[in-house]
Curated annotation (Swiss-Prot):
Organism: Acidovorax sp. (strain JS42)
Pfam families according to UniProt: DAHP_synth_1
Top EC category: transferase
Name of the protein described by the UniProt record: 2-dehydro-3-deoxyphosphooctonate aldolase
UniProt keyword Cytoplasm, yes or no: yes
Gene name as annotated: kdsA
BP terms from Gene Ontology: keto-3-deoxy-D-manno-octulosonic acid biosynthetic process
GO-annotated cellular components: cytoplasm
Length: 285
C-alpha cells in the first residue's frame, strides 16, 4: 500500500503517526513536529504528524475539548507547509468529513465509532486514506467486517479500496482498564489492511482518575517493543514535552525528550522481526 508517498507493509520499516493528543496551538505543534521529524529522519522512519482539533470523547463535560475545527485545521495546514510533513486528524461526525478531508492527508476514526455504518461510509468515500481504530469492545477478527464495509463504500464511488489501515488500541478489561493482546496484531492482518498499533492509548485507564482518564506511560516502551516484535506496518504514539501539563491524555503520553531513544530501540527490533520473516504464516500447513 502507498501512503503519503511511502510504501506501507510488513516488508517495510514501520511508519509512525505521532504528535500531541490535542492541538495546543501553532507554536507547540511546530515544536513537537519539528523534534519528531529530527528524530525520525536519520532512522528512516516515515512520519505522519497528528493532532486533534476536538476531543469529543471526554470523561467529564468540563474537560477541555480543544482548539476547534477551524483553528485546528489552520494549525495542521501550517505544520505541513512549514515542515513538509503529512498530517492526520480524527473526525467524529459525518458533517465534518468533507471539510477535514480537504485539508489533511489522512483521516482517523474514533474507536467507539467503528461499527457506525454511515460514518464509516462517509470517511471511506472522502478520497483520503483512513486509519480506522478498532473499538475497545471489538474482537480483532471482526475488524475484517469494518474494513470490508469501508472498501465497499469506496468502490461505490470509484475510489481505490487500498487506502485503509486497521488500528489496534487495546481492549476493555474490567472497569477503567485496557489491555493489549499481542495476538490481535496478527489476527487483524486477516482484514487485508496494514495494521497499526496505537501504543499510547493501549496503556490508558479510561476514566481512571475520576473526571479524567489515567494511564501508565511507563508501559509504553514495553508494549511498543512487544508490538514491533509481533510485526506491524505502523505505530501510533502520542507525545508531549511536558505530559503532566497536556490538555488531554498526559498520563499515557511519551515524554518528547525520550522519543528518539525509544525509536532507536524499536527500529532495531523491527529490522530483526522483518528480516527473519513471519513463521506463523506456515504453521497452518
Amino acid at each position: 500500500m502507498q501512503l503519503c508517498g511511502f510504501d506501507v507493509g510488513l516488508d517495510q520499516r514501520f511508519f509512525l503517526i505521532a504528535g500531541t493528543c490535542s492541538i495546543e496551538g501553532l507554536e507547540m505543534s511546530l515544536d513537537v513536529a519539528g523534534q519528531l521529524k529530527e528524530a525520525c529522519a536519520p532512522l528512516g522512519i516515515p512520519l505522519i504528524y497528528k493532532g486533534s482539533f476536538d476531543k469529543a470523547n471526554r470523561s467529564s463535560g468540563t474537560s477541555k475539548r480543544g482548539v476547534g475545527l477551524d483553528a485546528g485545521l489552520k494549525i495542521l495546514d501550517e505544520v505541513r507547509r512549514q515542515l513538509q510533513l503529512p498530517i492526520l486528524t480524527d473526525v467524529h461526525d459525518t458533517s465534518h468529513v468533507a471539510e477535514v478531508a480537504s485539508v489533511v492527508d489522512v483521516l482517523q476514526t474514533p474507536a467507539f465509532l467503528c461499527r457506525q455504518t454511515d460514518f464509516i461510509r462517509a470517511v471511506a468515500q472522502s478520497g483520503k486514506p483512513v486509519n480506522i481504530k478498532k473499538g475497545q469492545f471489538l474482537a480483532p477478527w471482526d475488524m475484517k467486517n469494518v474494513i470490508d464495509k469501508a472498501r465497499a463504500a469506496a468502490r461505490e464511488v470509484g475510489l481505490s479500496e487500498d487506502r485503509f489501515l486497521a488500528c489496534e488500541r487495546g481492549v476493555s478489561f474490567g472497569y477503567n482498564n485496557l489491555v493489549a493482546d499481542m495476538t490481535s496484531l496478527a489476527e487483524m492482518r486477516n482484514s487485508g489492511a496494514p495494521v497499526v498499533f496505537d501504543v499510547t492509548h493501549s496503556v490508558q485507564k479510561p476514566g481512571g482518575l475520576g473526571a479524567v482518564s489515567g494511564g501508565a506511560r511507563d508501559m509504553v516502551p514495553v508494549l511498543a517493543r512487544a508490538g514491533v516484535a509481533v510485526g506491524v506496518a505502523g505505530l501510533f504514539m502520542e507525545t508531549h514535552p511536558k505530559p503532566a501539563e497536556a490538555w488531554s491524555d498526559g498520563p499515557n503520553a511519551v515524554p518528547l525528550k525520550h522519543m528518539r531513544a525509544l525509536l532507536e530501540t524499536l527500529v532495531a527490533l523491527d529490522d530483526v522481526t522483518k528480516k527473519n520473516g513471519f513463521l506463523e504464516n506456515n504453521f497452518g500447513a
